[in-house]
Amino acid sequence: MMMQQNKILIFLLLFLCFSGIEKLFAQQRYNIAAVDLMMLKRQKIGAIPLASQVGVQGLELDMGGLGNRPTFDNQLLNDSIRAQFLQQAKAFNITFCSLSMSGYYAQSFCGRENFVQSIEDCIRTMKLMNVKVGFLPLGVQCDLVKHPELMESVVSRLQRVGKMASAAGVVIGIETTLDASAEKKLLKQVGSNAIKSYFNFSNPLKNGRDLYKELKILGRKNIIQIHCTDDDGVLLKDNTRLDMKKVKQTLDKMGWSGWLVLERSRDAKEPNNVKKNFGSNAAYMKSIFQ
């Protein structure tokens, strides 16, 4: 009788041990972050405690506005301000997973006369803050679906960015409007391991493409990070066109790991209720991925 009880006890201990290891592995494989800009805290130190409150592990910090300036309105190159951000991040156990050059959503990366300084400033900031990923959206003016004639300019400029990023030991993740096959071809033309796809779920979803197939086409090695939300309208848990469990199954099979970054998918009735929108989406993502 005693021997039987000991066997049961050993079995339970082993089960709990392996369960703990699986949970730890899942947490290491998928981490959840949020975009400071979309939390209405663009380059504001208050984004750090807010990130902790809504339950994410990381932040994508914005480089600041661009407009017609030669470079971003970036406070993070100020030593004292940057030190405050780093201290707060340590205090709240928040990781800066990426720096976003969101100014290029509106400004033209492919047509801007002096694009190099802005990229250099982003990479310099990344190095100073030990951030390994930069986000570069090609934006409305470099939409390669609507303006395929811009492809040569985009490839040439990305090759230059790739050399800069490679020399610094960082990766720049790009967002385009191309489907996965065309984006994979673009990455091949650029030919740099320092230029990858920063995949955004909303792009295939709003264009009627198969999100899960697109992930598989691009493949594990080409995707550096993921904006894991749809357009604004409903929260992730209420989104009927986005099967997050199927997303996880797809990423698991691909062997992909990294940061899943909450950007949009805000409730249209309360778009500025940051704690509700990001708190709900963070909890939902953690319930599936962690």
Predicted feature descriptions by range:
Residues 24-127, 184, 192, 278-290:
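N-terminal pre-domain/capping segments
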Residues 75-82, 113-120, 148-158, 210-216, ...:
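Charged helix-capping and loop-helix junction motifs
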Residues 67-72, 105-109, 142-147, 206-208, ...:
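A short acidic, helix-capping loop that chelates divalent metal ions and anchors anionic groups
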Residues 38, 63-65, 102-105, 138-142, ...:
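Active-site-proximal loop/turn and secondary-structure-junction residues that shape catalytic pockets
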Residues 60, 98-100, 135, 173, ...:
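Conserved beta-strand positions in the central sheet of alpha/beta enzyme cores
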Residues 1-28:
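Bacterial Sec-dependent N-terminal signal peptides
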